[in-house]
């Protein structure tokens, strides 16, 4: 397993059920028009969706919390109702979407709550067993009621049975805040979310664009080395194309409404698979052309409800480095081994630890998947056998170990360890089989990353597809001259840029891998009148050596320049003053005559107060060794 440390906090479902009932009692008492629509568990507690005529905002949370406290102190008895009771049956006649709920009677009134995942749960019999309820968030959510869209209020909450559980929760929330990619993205000027541009449509700022380009450059190089061709396809596609693929019928609610052009309907594409299939079909293929590999940096659009949008994690416009491989059945194992190698290599490059590899299989509800029992059995067995061959024990590379050892020799550069890989020298990746997570067209291998907050995220995927090539009548000529249908492998090495960058920001708390930083070094002359000329020459030297450098030639005091550099989490902060200028041999930097340029610098690391002095030549040598890939 990886070395990640997560904060121990276990959600207590019994107390959250009781607290959801206490909130309903408090709301009914204080808001006569209160009408419950939904109550559901959430990652850290639960939420309720309801309607009230009054306008409710975050300003009302303190008032509602006090009323909940009165309900808890009031010691209301809670009686569990049987599902087959006449009272519950009567409610379910009009509330069919509550069929999986649990029902209770309190003071002769019937209330409902979510049914916990745990079995043999012991429900609270009185509200006074609740120690504390915290309302964490309030917002709006749209709901379709009798074919009308109505605006509901959603309150998220967490409940506790002890001070210890609340303290663990508080610790977790503080860590969540410190790792919130939205806050980090704003501080580092990575991206912008402006509702005037539209909810769920992120705007990449200059630093974010730089970061994306760094990731893109690496991926293009890797995909080229593994024999992929880059293609480019339109962001619109005909509705009939997505109807043929099945994406329209199966995921209609995740698509934007069709656009009518010249009496034909078009969709903002939600994925590139159909376009890439058309690329494959554009010319005759034989077995000699397989495997046929293509990739694309594709702009995609998928509909998400406004309540489901979360920073870069859940958006409506996204960019995916999407790739597909068309191959014979005999190619499958070789290709998957190759793609697995690409994933592990890529994650290592970006300092991401894969924690678990899932074999995602179909569930017993076979009507959700394409109907071919033999292919499903064959493909699932095939992936299972391939996974057994993978040895998921990883260790640091020789270069990374040497990098650590080199830094240890230079105590004044200890601050740079923050930008090293953080995992142990070696760890083992867990393997798991998960039913019900297959795509409708075939089984898949999902690579899972566990955040420092204990949340699982699918970071990479390899998906087998026997269906779409048939639907689009893809074919190739085999060795014996017969016509065969190829197998399609869908491959996502990092998922979307948006999700991947949100993971990077959260994982590192904004201390991105050194090689990805928009600004690795900042140079700050104390006084432009006396120190700027040397600062400019130093900047040229670092840029010549491949570093991303910023010169702060503003007229601000040095103390303010340092504060700005600290806020931007810039690792190396170089200060040019009288002493440094005096050390300069007054020769300008010339890349053709680099040896003639010489001088000293003073520098401090992010988070450090001490300043160190060194020669430019020595500092460049150390940094080149530290930052090499």
Give residue ranges: language-model regions.
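C-terminal structured "cap/appendage" subdomains that terminate the fold
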Residues: 539-622
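A structural preference for short, hydrophobic beta-strand core positions in alpha/beta folds
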Residues: 38, 80-82, 232-233, 396, ...
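Structured aminoacyl-transfer and RNA-binding surfaces used for tRNA recognition/handling
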Residues: 56-63, 206-507, 511-518, 524-537
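Auxiliary tRNA-acceptor-end handling modules of aminoacyl-tRNA synthetases
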Residues: 2-15, 24-26, 31, 35-43, ...
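A short, glycine/Asx- and small/polar-enriched loop/turn
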Residues: 42-46, 440-444, 566-569
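A short, contiguous, amphipathic alpha-helix enriched in charged residues
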Residues: 16-28, 378-389, 542-544
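Residue patterns forming the tRNA-binding/recognition surfaces of aminoacyl-tRNA synthetases
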Residues: 180-182, 205-214, 578, 605, ...
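Metal-dependent nuclease catalytic cores in nucleic-acid-processing enzymes
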Residues: 19-29, 494, 498-508, 572-573
